[in-house]
Structure formats: structure tokens, C-alpha cells
Swiss-Prot record:
It holds the Pfam family Terpene_synth_C. GO terms for molecular function: magnesium ion binding; terpene synthase activity. The gene is TPS14. The Asp-Asp-Xaa-Xaa-Asp/Glu (DDXXD/E) motif is important for the catalytic activity, presumably through binding to Mg(2+). The lineage of its organism: Eukaryota, Viridiplantae, Streptophyta, Embryophyta, Tracheophyta. It comes from Solanum lycopersicum. Pathway: Secondary metabolite biosynthesis; terpenoid biosynthesis. Keywords: Lyase, Magnesium, Metal-binding. It catalyses: (2Z,6Z)-farnesyl diphosphate = (E)-alpha-bisabolene + diphosphate; (2Z,6Z)-farnesyl diphosphate = beta-bisabolene + diphosphate; (2E,6E)-farnesyl diphosphate = beta-bisabolene + diphosphate; (2E,6E)-farnesyl diphosphate = (Z)-gamma-bisabolene + diphosphate. Mg(2+) 3 binds at residues 463, 471. This is Sesquiterpene synthase 14. It is an enzyme of class 4 (lyase). InterPro entries: Isoprenoid_synthase_dom_sf, Terpene_cyclase-like_1_C, Terpene_cyclase_plant_C1, Terpene_synth_N, Terpene_synth_N_sf, Terpene_synthase-like, Terpene_synthase_metal-bd, Terpenoid_cyclase/PrenylTrfase.
């Protein structure tokens, strides 16, 4: 006991010594972030509490086989097959049936291609099929919707009587690419009419419409969709009890797995001693884990979630160091040290920065150790290259702030799409996921793809829209809003409109690669798509001020039960 007390005392003295070496005469642009809303909550999820029983595993496999049978035995030519696939995807269990769904959608697409002239006037079926087929990366022409328009290209008013048809047309529009004017028209038409009819709908349909208008299926995070749709689905009179039982049990088992991982990561975070070593930074361990789960939620991605969470934690602290605490003169040697990525650089940086630098070094050591097991240690090179780009871009922002520079929009975006860290996270996702990726595919993603820069632009502009007011309450570098206002002598509102226009176009770039970059496996594109979805669901600056929507979402995924034993 005496030894432990001595060790703790030594640790406290060391921390005090590090912090006491900060020049207190320097004025620092402190952001005054709120403390974590979760603190050590997830430490309570012990291995015993999160253990998955052999009975649960057995029951899951039995139910999965029955759902698989249901999926295989339903004819690919039937409307029921489309509805079943859509339901399985929304309920979050499609990952169990990837191959079956892939084969079915291929058959459905082939059948459509052979019978294009067949007269199908059911908007619900046409729109649902369009969304599911494009969702599996088959290019189905948007001309399928021409039959629902008048000679002037406007959608027929008679369609307003078909709520499910309108809802599915609305959902389909979010898979549009550049130049699809009919889908632009469809989006405007469906939003207008769904909003006006929503108050008159029955509770179940009203819930679906309300949720869709807030967040369409395609741009939503699949793991977030699942618990919300489970609650909607069990209130649909025609729901399938067996399917409902399966999805609830699957959600429950995955939730236990995520709780255990959160508990382990909370211990790691506690050992980092945030409040003493990084008091200037956001305390966002749980939110970082949510981000990682939004990219990869399946049981096979435990390592990926751990490594991505740690990376986002390090990026968050580093971002706050550059953005809300350190001086420019302190940041120059720190940037050089990160580029060197070696222990000998430790003496060149301010003492209070050294704990973070050590965590940074430890992270890349851990990555190298993990990838060596897979024979993929050479992948670490790509992560280090992206980290160097990121850290240099942080310094560029600090330089702009120091010199009161508001750059032109294009110059701002070139730098800011790096500082949003989307590319760093994306490349790390691909590195740690455990899949084989060729050098050519890495090079394509980094240098040639539309999807990677589009995803970064969405993240940057959405972050600037939702975080702008908070950031301008303190000394902070210019966002896209300030750059646009200055360059074009525009209002803030006009800047927001332009940012949203560019976000919409970036989604079309994502969809273009998703549909047409057929040489690239889906698992390579999926993380970029999911990273875009993660930021798209945020309504305010939820990552920084995570006491509202994001807190409720995290609770929904990692705390609340879906009653796995009570199945309708």
C-alpha cells in the first residue's frame, strides 16, 4: 500500500513539474470545453456483465439460419424480396447475409435490364428497386422515373396520394450523381409533399416520414438506423416475429461486445491522465469510440475499432493543442518532432507536450506491432504520410491565425480538408481493418479517387456550418464562412447556402465513385461513405458539445436495451 501511495505521489509531482514549466504569462485562446458527460461510466461494464453466453450464441445462429432461409426462399422476382432486403438492411443485420443479398440484387438488376420496356407503374416498387440496386453499386438509370412525370418534366400531382411511393422516391434521390435533373426535381417534389402530409398520417407512417426527413437512409449511419427502425418495425402490424427476435438478439450481443470494448478503452484513457496532462483538450473518449463504431460495427472489427478510437483521441488532443492552447513558437518544434516520429525528438519540444508526443509514438509502435502479425507492417508508411500532412496543415492554420490571415476559399479548403483529419482516419481504417489492399488501391484512394476528397469536404464544410458560432466566441482561425464572406462580400447566410451546395455536390462525387469505380472493392469505399454519414447526422456541434443529440445517440447504441428477450 505504501509503495502504491509513493508511486501515485511521484506521478502527481511529475505532472505538476510538467505543467509548471508552461509559461503562465502567455495568453492562450482557451476554449473552455465542458467535461465528459460519460466520465468513467463504462468502467462498470465488467467482463462478467458483458459476457455473451453460449445459449445466446446458439440461439443467434439458429435464428440466423431461419432468416437466411426466408431470404433465399423468397423469389427475386417478387416485391416481397425487395421489401425483405430493405427491412433486413434497416434493422442492421444485413452484414450476416452479404452474399445472399448481393446475389439477389444482381438477379433483380439483370431481370430489369432484360425487361426494360415492361410497364411498371408502381412508384413504390420502382423507387425501392432503384435504391437497393444502386446501393449494391449497379448503375440503374434515373430514367426509370420519367414515366411518373408530365411533359414539362414535373412529377404528376396524382403521386401525392401514394405516401409510401413518395417516401421511397425521396430516399432514392440521395443516390443521385451529377447531371440527374430528374432526381433533383424528385427531391424537391417529395420533400414539399411529405412535409405537408406528415401531420395527417397514422403514427407508424408518420414516424417513418419524420425520421426520413431528418435523416435519409442512405446518408444515415447504419448502426444508428438499426435501433430506431427496430422500434418502428415492431409497431408495424405485418412485422415478422422471427425476424424481430433475431435482430433484437443480434443488437443485444453486439451491444455487449461494444460495452466491453468501451470499458477497456476507458481504462486506457484513464491511464492517459487527461485532466492533468491535457486539461486544454476535449475529453471525448466515448464520442471517439462512437465514431469508430460508425465506420465498423461488426464483430470482426474489434481491432479496427480500438485503433481508430485511439487515433481519433490523439487527433482530438492534437487539434486542441494547435487550435486552443499552444503558441506558434511551441508548435513549430512539435510539428518537426511529429514528422521525425522518433524518441530522440522528445527534448526538442516543450515539457508539457511530451506526454502527448509519447502517446503518439506509442500509437505507431502499436500499429506496427499489430500489422506485423498480419505481414502488413509496410502499411504503416501510409498512416505516417497522412499524419505528416495533417500536422503541417495544423501549423498552417496556426500561422494564418498568428498573422490574422483570412485566405481565399479555395486555399482554405485545400488546407482545411486535411485538418478535418478525415483522410488520416480513412487511411487508418483501411490499414487496420484486416483486409488485403494492394499498393495500387492505396495510391488510387489517396491520389485519384473522388470519394476521399469528397468525404473530407463534407466533413470540413459540415463542421464549419455547425461549429462556426461556437468557434468565433474565442480567438480562432477563419472557417469557410469567414473566407466566403470576405472573398465574395457575402452574408453569413449566403456562405451557409454555398457550403450546403458544395456538400450536396460532394455527395454526388461519392456516389459517382461508388457506382463507377468498379475496380475498387466495396470494403475500400465503405469507410469513406460511413465517415461522411457520421458527420451528416450531426445537427449541431455535437462532437464538441456532446450533451444533446450525440449523448442520446450514444445512449441508444451502448446503454439502452432493445429487449432482446421480449420480441413483439
Amino acid at each position: 500500500m505504501a509503495t502504491n501511495l509513493t508511486l501515485e505521489t511521484d506521478k502527481e509531482i511529475k505532472n505538476m513539474n510538467q505543467l509548471s514549466m508552461i509559461d503562465t504569462t502567455i495568453t492562450r485562446p482557451l476554449a473552455n470545453y465542458h467535461s465528459s458527460v460519460w466520465k468513467n461510466y463504462f468502467l462498470s461494464y465488467t467482463p462478467q456483465l458483458t459476457e455473451i453466453s453460449s445459449q445466446e450464441k446458439l440461439e443467434l445462429e439458429e435464428l440466423k439460419e431461419k432468416v437466411r432461409q426466408m431470404l433465399v426462399e423468397t423469389s427475386d422476382k417478387s416485391t416481397q424480396k425487395l421489401v425483405l432486403i430493405d427491412t433486413i438492411q434497416r434493422l442492421g443485420v444485413a452484414y450476416h447475409f452479404d452474399n445472399e443479398i448481393k446475389i439477389s440484387i444482381q438477379n433483380i438488376f439483370d431481370e430489369f435490364e432484360q425487361n426494360k420496356n415492361e410497364d411498371d407503374n408502381d412508384l413504390y416498387i420502382v423507387a425501392l428497386r432503384f435504391r437497393l440496386v444502386r446501393g449494391q453499386r449497379h448503375y440503374m438509370s434515373s430514367d426509370v422515373f420519367k414515366k411518373f412525370t408530365n411533359d414539362d418534366g414535373k412529377f404528376k400531382e396524382t403521386l401525392t396520394k401514394d405516401v409510401q411511393g413518395l417516401l421511397n422516391l425521396y430516399e432514392a434521390t440521395h443516390l443521385r450523381v451529377h447531371g440527374e435533373q430528374i432526381l433533383e426535381e424528385a427531391l424537391s417534389f417529395t420533400v414539399t409533399h411529405l412535409k405537408s402530409m406528415s401531420p395527417k398520417l397514422d403514427s407508424s407512417l408518420k414516424a417513418q416520414v419524420s425520421e426520413a426527413l431528418i435523416q435519409p437512409i442512405y446518408t444515415n449511419v447504419p448502426r444508428v438506423v438499426a435501433p430506431k427502425y427496430i422500434r418502428i418495425y415492431e409497431n408495424i402490424e405485418s412485422h415478422d416475429d422471427l425476424l424481430l427476435k433475431f435482430v433484437k438478439l443480434d443488437f443485444h450481443i453486439l451491444q455487449k461486445m461494444h460495452q466491453r470494448e468501451l470499458s477497456e478503452l476507458t481504462r486506457w484513457w484513464k491511464d492517459l491522465d487527461h485532466s492533468n496532462k491535457y486539461p486544454y483538450a476535449r475529453d471525448k473518449l466515448v464520442e471517439c469510440y462512437f465514431w469508430a463504431t460508425g465506420v465498423y460495427f461488426g464483430p470482426q472489427y474489434k481491432r479496427a475499432r480500438r485503433m481508430i478510437t485511439k487515433l481519433i483521441v490523439i487527433i482530438t488532443i492534437t487539434d486542441d493543442l494547435y487550435d486552443a492552447y499552444a503558441t506558434y513558437d511551441e508548435l513549430v518544434p512539435y510539428t518537426n518532432a511529429v514528422e521525425r516520429c522518433e524518441i530522440s525528438a522528445m527534448d526538442s519540444i516543450s515539457p508539457y507536450m511530451r506526454p502527448l508526443y509519447q502517446v503518439f509514438l506509442d500509437y505507431f509502435d502499436e500499429m506496427e506491432e499489430e500489422l506485423t502479425k498480419d505481414g502488413k507492417a509496410h502499411y504503416v508508411y501510409y498512416a505516417k504520410v497522412e499524419m505528416n500532412k495533417l500536422i503541417k496543415s495544423y501549423l498552417k492554420e496556426a500561422e494564418w491565425l498568428k498573422n490574422d490571415i483570412i485566405p481565399k476559399c479555395e486555399e482554405y479548403k485545400r488546407n482545411a480538408t486535411i485538418t478535418v483529419a478525415n483522410q488520416m482516419i480513412l487511411i487508418t481504417c483501411l490499414i487496420v481493418a484486416g483486409e488485403f489492399i494492394s499498393k495500387e488501391t492505396f495510391e488510387w484512394m489517396i491520389n485519384e479517387s473522388l470519394i476521399a476528397p469528397a468525404s473530407s469536404l463534407i466533413n470540413r464544410l459540415k463542421d464549419d456550418i455547425i461549429g462556426h458560432e461556437h468557434e468565433q466566441q474565442r480567438e480562432h482561425g477563419a472557417s469557410f464562412v469567414e473566407c466566403y464572406v470576405k472573398e465574395y462580400r457575402a452574408s453569413k447566410q449566403e456562405a451557409y447556402v454555398e457550403a450546403r451546395r458544395q456538400i450536396a455536390n460532394a455527395w454526388k462525387d461519392i456516389n459517382t465513385d461508388y457506382l463507377h469505380a468498379t475496380q475498387v472493392p466495396t470494403f475500400v469505399l465503405q469507410p469513406a461513405l460511413n465517415l461522411s454519414r457520421l458527420v451528416d447526422i450531426l445537427q449541431e456541434d455535437d462532437f464538441t458539445d456532446s450533451q444533446n443529440f450525440l449523448k442520446d445517440t450514444i445512449k441508444l447504441l451502448f446503454v439502452d436495451s432493445v429487449n432482446s428477450t421480449s420480441c413483439g
